[in-house]
């Protein structure tokens, strides 16, 4: 078994928009072929190789199943350095949106209605990010701009985690 990237490992087209059912079926097929139990009577070297392939298949599936991780993977495969730790430059409109969401998060800690409103708004932001990334990657092949959107999406996910951890005070 040889595969240069996660998509070819599963025999899928290299694109952002993926059918999750097709992805899962492809993962199950690969996982069944390389499952270590199939190599129980094989040599130690063959068992080790099977274990490595199983781990690789699981990691590839984890990254492709999550739309944000998939977008990040595609950008990195295209040679885009996302500089997630050092590049904080973002669109001014998105920076304003961040500030607004931060204020909403403060309100959400005290108000169940604000909590629900912010959760819904972040879910809509996720959907918009997915649509934008599908267009940037699959239609335009603009991985640089997609990288910028991935960094924005990472902020949205971080804020969503903070929101989940925040419980409105009664």
Swiss-Prot record:
CDD domains: DnaJ. GO terms for cellular component: iron-sulfur cluster transfer complex. The keyword Chaperone applies. SUPFAM superfamilies: Chaperone J-domain (SSF46565), HSC20 (HSCB), C-terminal oligomerisation domain (SSF47144). One of its GO terms (biological process) is protein complex oligomerization. Residues 5-79 form the J domain. SMART domains: DnaJ. It comes from the Bacteria. One of its GO terms (molecular function) is ATPase activator activity. Keywords: Chaperone. InterPro entries: DnaJ_domain, HscB, HscB_C_sf, HscB_oligo_C, J_dom_sf. Pfam families: HSCB_C. Coiled coil: none annotated. Belongs to the HscB family. Co-chaperone involved in the maturation of iron-sulfur cluster-containing proteins. Seems to help targeting proteins to be folded toward HscA. PANTHER family: IRON-SULFUR CLUSTER CO-CHAPERONE PROTEIN HSCB. HAMAP family: HscB. Interacts with HscA and stimulates its ATPase activity. This is Co-chaperone protein HscB homolog. The lineage of its organism: Bacteria, Pseudomonadati, Pseudomonadota, Betaproteobacteria, Burkholderiales. The gene is hscB.
């Amino acid at each position: 078994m040889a595969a240069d990237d996660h998509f070819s490992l599963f025999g899928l087209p290299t694109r952002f928009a993926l059918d999750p059912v097709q992805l899962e079926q492809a993962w199950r097929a690969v996982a069944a072929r390389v499952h270590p139990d199939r190599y129980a009577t094989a040599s130690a070297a063959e068992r080790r190789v099977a274990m490595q392939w199983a781990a690789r298949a699981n990691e590839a599936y984890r990254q492709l199943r999550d739309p944000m991780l998939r977008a990040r993977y595609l950008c990195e495969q295209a040679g885009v350095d996302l500089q997630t730790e050092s590049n904080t430059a973002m669109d001014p409109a998105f920076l304003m949106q961040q500030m607004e969401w931060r204020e909403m998060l403060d309100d959400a800690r005290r108000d169940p209605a604000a909590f629900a409103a912010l959760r819904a708004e972040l879910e809509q932001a996720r959907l918009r990010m997915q649509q934008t990334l599908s267009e940037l990657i699959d239609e335009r092949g603009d991985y640089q701009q997609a990288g910028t959107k991935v960094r924005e999406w990472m902020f949205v996910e971080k804020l969503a985690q903070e929101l989940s951890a925040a419980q409105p005070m009664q």
